[in-house]
Amino acid sequence: ISCSLVGSEMCIRDSIGTGKIAKKLICILRGFGMNILAYDLYPDYNFAREHQVVYTSLDELYHNSDIISLHCPLTEQTKYLINDYSISKMKDGVMIINTGRGQLIHTNALIEGLKNKKIGSAGLDVYEEESEYFYEDQSDKIIDDDTLARLLSFNNVIVTSHQAFFTREALANIASTTLQNIKDCLL
């Protein structure tokens, strides 16, 4: 059985700033009437006011969110942001989505949370040890990573290969920015 987004408490977690991706998602989710909670080291209060986002502490965010979506870089502060301790503070049945970096989530803690039903579901566009399994076709190989194999065995977990940069537009933007940076250095 699925859940309704209407009226859900949604947490957008971005540790360095409510960045472009999180802001786009917030705009989409507000269309469903979702209440948005956010934690950010550098809150964008103008954006929050305009889009009815409530900045809060991590503890309040964990305690009140039905859905936790991670959109932040991997830093010393964010490594294993989702772990046994943070999961214990979350609502029962919470949905966790990670499109940021794999090591934002301690995978074994996620698995335990899924097994004991503390975590109701997970959507992972990144994985802690993804380098061997993503970015090239591995469909003819056996997965020898027992942790990844266990994650894939859950019917309430979706794992996709992180391909955020791999579009024509993104590659053109990367090339354009690189060329501009070179020009700026030479001038």
Segments predicted by a language model, with ranges:
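Short acidic low-complexity segments
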Residues: H51-S65
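Glycine-rich Rossmann-fold phosphate-binding loop(s) that bind the pyrophosphate
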Residues: T18-G19
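Single conserved hydrophobic/aromatic residue that forms the stacking wall/gate
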Residues: I1-G7, C11-I12
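Phosphate-binding beta-alpha-beta segment of Rossmann-like dinucleotide-binding domains, i.e.
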Residues: S8-E9, K24-C27
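Rossmann-like dinucleotide-binding domain for NAD(H)/NADP(H)
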Residues: G93, Q103-L187
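Rossmann-fold NAD(P) dinucleotide-binding segment
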Residues: Q77-I96
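NAD(P)-binding Rossmann-fold cofactor-contacting core
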Residues: G31-R49, Y127-E129
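Short glycine-/small-residue-rich Rossmann-like dinucleotide-binding loops
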Residues: D66, C72-L74, G100-R101, Y127-E128
